[in-house]
UniProtKB/Swiss-Prot annotation:
Gene Ontology terms describing biological process: translational initiation
Region named G3: 452-455
Species for this entry: Vibrio cholerae serotype O1 (strain ATCC 39315 / El Tor Inaba N16961)
Name this polypeptide is given: Translation initiation factor IF-2
All copies of domain tr-type G, residue ranges: 397-566
Main location as per UniProt: cytoplasm
Length: 898
């Protein structure tokens, strides 16, 4: 047995020595580099690797090849009376294939099905033959009865005719009476014969029907007993149809059934069966074959009558979940998947057999095919776990949640900054709030929770999320700037959420301030001040100097008293995720605003598709807290992943059920997203075919918080045009990793980091692959540079600019160049290699290029305005006096994204 060392084996198979030693150890063989490896150990390692890669049957070879060598010596005559010995080697190679039990089972089932089909065919043919025989007999008896009746009628008519002839020559009254009596007697005899014939026919048909019923009952009992016997024998007998003997027997048996059926049909067609008893006796005898063969049961081949029942397709109820695969829907309706696809195409939707469709589409398709649909609710567990809460406590007053909204640089963060007596605005990049900040402050009149939302257009989704979680909206409007687009959006969000609006007119300390103009502009959007008869409070403030900030707080608390805000302080907490991010040292971090109950350290929290136990809680200044009540924002640690901003955070009892609900939500989100992506209508087919002409700018986006990722991705996607499409191939929260760099290299994308940086391994990968990496801290710069990159991908526009015009004064003939136009340059300059147009009566009649440009018989590169020259137009000789020659050049204009 050949043995080689571990090092030699690693060189032979091209695997590092360390990796090979690990694989040997996993297979249960501890080896060193210098140890030997036998063939058995190689096979053991190979079987382990196959099993590890998913090939569970890899250790059992299904094909065995045997090679044999036979050596012999042959004596050959070499001539001259000498002989020499020749070594002869005979090589034989034989391959044995192990057939799987599944194939054996399939073969046996196929043969059994063939046998059953042959038996059914024979039984059906026998029934048809018996039925035909009964019909022939009844028909024959009816014909005989009709013949007898016709004969009796004919005899009666002849007798009556004779009597009539005799009656034409009456001789006396006595003879007349005799004739009348004879006629009546003949009529009575005729009626008795008809009644007797009808009675006999009825008795015969009744007797036939009774015998047929008895025969059917007797045969039915015997056939059921035979079927049970055959089933028991098939269960107790182990047929190895792969062996030659049993395969031959099964084939012979099938041939016998086929031959018997053919022979019976031939005999039935050749001659009529005259007697029902003979028919029954013949049908009850076994046909052909070896009756004594083991495992064979002789069965009756036919019966008299067959009873057919109309087959009706069963229309079962189809249970449809929120999403379903086309093949699964077809299986539930007991039809082929191609039929379902045809119906969907008729309804205007294209689908494949493995495509996921939504519940509404599946319902329409099933009802179109005549089935009753039962819609299944798949979130029963989710509803059960969310309803299992101990929130039956008394409601108490809570602090208002106030959202500061407004346009960019109108002073939102500065206003909140002055209230909290901190300087957060200076820490934000560019003085612009990049993500939601949640703070609660204590005032002399009570506690207020503030949410600071970004103001520029990219963060519309974040601002809408802030409006959903808030009680009062403070709209900050600069007195010197007035109403701006983001101001209008903030008003719309507040009205959509049904939240009362307080207007803070900021920057009133400036000389250009005009508060009345702000009121007038806001009144156009149904924001009316109280002094004008409206419902909105207007407060004039200056965030820079702190003017009337206390008045703003009083207005907020006054509005909160009117709203009578209450919440359950005890029990299991629920709230909303304001912001989320991935911290390098602490993992997923979510900012949660508690809306009811008390959130405690150690609670099990379910947030959208994520779950986990609260390991730590921090307030807005970073201090550890043990619990948080209503209207208190806290940062929680311990979730399984980064939840989406805006998800509902709920405390549940069971961590296992929370994991099930989170996994169900993740799977449902994936299925719905897949169904939305794969949906393709017939009317969009041609637009999908032409989509290959669109240039794509692939981007891998990483940001510090989830809200920034959503806002930036939405803004970049909106930049897409018909010619350039922005494709976000990957996005996430946290630093730029090596995985992001690999994704960017594979998809030819640029990597964009917003307030994040790349780690060392990612930087090495980016340098090696020459990937474009860009860092940003202000979203305006990010969007502008992406616009520039998209502009570079646009196909340029070309513009033709006229640079010179010459008038033809005379025409000369040249044997070498043809017609030469003697011209005077009237405008611009005539260049030698520029394209030209020939104009006649200000109409273009030819477009081409110059072949010759001369001045005083000298070739020149250009001729300026006011000089004469000779121009030869290439491939054009129809130049006339008075024509104009226009010289132009094509200029490329770079397009930009607006």
């Amino acid at each position: 047995m050949t043995q080689i060392t571990v090092k030699a084996l690693s060189e032979e198979i091209g695997t590092p020595v360390d990796r090979l030693l690990e694989q040997l150890a996993d297979a249960g063989m501890n080896k060193a580099v210098a140890d030997h490896v036998s063939e058995d150990e190689k096979q053991k390692l190979l079987a382990h690797l196959r099993k590890e890669h998913g090939d569970a049957t890899g250790s059992e070879p299904t094909r065995l090849t045997l090679q044999r060598k036979t050596r012999s010596t042959l004596s050959v005559n070499a001539g001259g009376g000498k002989s020499k010995n020749v070594q002869v080697e005979v090589r034989k190679k034989r391959t044995y294939v192990k057939r799987s039990s599944v194939e054996d089972e399939a073969t046996r089932e196929a043969e059994e099905a063939a046998m059953r089909a042959a038996e059914e065919q024979a039984k059906r043919e026998a029934e048809e033959a018996a039925q035909r025989a009964a019909e022939e007999k009844a028909k024959r008896e009816a014909e005989e009865a009709a013949k007898r009746e016709a004969e009796a009628k004919r005899m009666a008519e002849e007798k009556a005719k004779r009597e009539t002839q005799a009656a034409t020559q009456p001789r006396s009254d006595e003879e007349k009476l005799k004739q009348e009596a004879a006629r009546k007697e003949a009529e009575a005899l005729k009626r008795r014969q008809e009644e007797e014939a009808r009675r006999k026919a009825e008795e015969e048909s009744r007797r036939q029907l009774e015998k047929v019923r008895e025969l059917a009952e007797k045969n039915g009992e015997r056939w059921s007993a035979d079927k049970e016997t055959v089933g028991d024998m098939q269960e107790n007998t182990d047929y190895h149809v792969t062996t030659s003997r049993y395969a031959r027997e099964a084939e012979d048996e099938a041939d016998l059934h086929e031959e018997g059926a053919r022979r019976r049909s031939t005999k039935a067609n050749k001659r009529k069966m005259s007697s029902r008893d003979d028919n029954q006796e013949r049908d009850s005898r076994p046909r052909g074959g070896k009756a004594g063969r083991k495992g064979r049961i002789n069965k009756p081949m036919s019966m008299q009558h067959g009873f057919d029942k109309t087959a009706v397709v069963a229309k079962a109820d189809v249970v449809v979940g929120e999403t379903i695969v086309v093949s699964e829907l077809a299986q539930k309706m007991s039809v082929k998947a191609t039929e379902v696809i045809k119906v969907m195409m008729k309804m205007g939707a294209m689908a494949t057999i493995n495509q996921v469709i939504d519940q509404e589409t599946a319902q329409l398709v099933a009802e179109e095919m005549g089935h009753k649909v039962v819609l299944r609710k798949e979130n029963e567990l989710e509803e059960a776990i969310l309803s299992d809460r101990d929130d039956k406590f008394e409601e108490v007053s809570r602090a208002p949640v106030v959202t500061i909204m407004g346009h960019v640089d109108h002073g939102k963060t500065s206003t909140l900054d002055y209230i909290r007596r901190t300087h957060v605005a200076s820490g934000e990049a560019g003085g612009i709030t990049q993500h939601i900040g949640a703070y609660h402050v204590e005032t002399p009149n009570g506690m207020i929770t503030f949410l600071d939302t970004p103001g520029h257009a990219a963060f519309t989704a974040m601002r809408a999320r802030g409006a959903q979680a808030t009680d009062i909206v403070v709209l900050v409007v600069a007195a010197d700037d007035g109403v701006m687009p983001q101001t209008v959006e903030a008003i719309q969000h507040a009205k959509a959420a049904g939240v009362p609006l307080i207007v803070a007119v900021n920057k009133i300390d400036k000389d250009t301030a005009n508060p009345d103009n702000v009121k007038t502009e806001l009144s156009q959007y149904n924001v009316m001040p109280e002094e004008w008869g409206g419902d909105n409070m207007f407060v004039h403030i200056s965030a820079k100097q702190g003017t009337n900030i206390d008045g703003l707080l009083e207005a907020i608390l006054l509005q909160a008293e009117v709203l009578e805000l209450k919440a359950v302080k005890q029990g299991m907490a629920s709230g909303v995720v304001i912001e989320s991010r991935l911290d390098k040292g602490r993992g997923p971090v979510a900012t949660v605003l508690v809306q009811s109950g008390t959130l405690r350290k150690g609670d099990i929290v379910l947030c959208g598709q994520e779950y986990g136990r609260v390991r730590a809680m921090r307030d807005e200044v970073g201090n550890e807290v043990e619990e948080a009540g209503p209207s208190i924002p806290v940062e929680i640690l311990g979730l399984s992943g980064v939840p989406a901003a805006g998800d509902e955070a709920t405390v549940v009892r069971d961590e296992r059920k929370a994991r099930e609900v989170a996994n169900y939500r993740a799977g449902k989100f994936r299925e719905v997203k897949l169904a939305r992506q794969q949906k393709s209508k017939l009317e969009n087919m041609f637009s999908n075919m032409t989509a290959g002409d669109v240039a794509e700018l692939n981007i891998v986006l990483k940001a510090d918080v989830q809200g920034s990722v959503e806002a930036i991705a939405d803004s970049l996607t909106k930049l897409s045009t018909d010619e350039v499409k922005v494709n976000i191939v990957g996005s996430g929260v946290g630093g730029i990793t090596e995985t992001d760099a690999v994704l960017a290299a594979a998809s030819n994308a640029i990597v964009v980091g917003f307030n994040v940086r790349a780690d060392a391994s990612a930087r090495r990968m980016i340098e090696a692959e020459n990937i474009d990496l860009r860092y940003y801290s202000i979203i305006y710069q990010l969007i502008d540079e992406v616009k520039q990159a998209m502009s570079g991908m646009l196909s340029p526009e070309f513009k033709q600019e006229i640079i010179g015009l010459a008038e033809v004064r005379d025409v000369f003939k040249s044997p070498k160049l043809g017609a030469i136009a003697g011209c005077m340059v009237t405008e611009g300059v005539i260049k030698r290699n520029a394209p030209i147009r020939v104009l006649r009566d200000n109409v273009v009649i030819y477009e081409g290029e110059l072949e010759s440009l001369r001045r005083f018989k000298d070739d020149v590169a250009e001729v300026k305005n006011g000089y004469e020259c000779g121009i030869g137009v290439k491939n054009y000789n129809d130049v006339r006096v008075g024509d104009q020659i226009e010289v132009f050049e094509t200029i490329e204009i770079q397009r930009t994204i607006d």
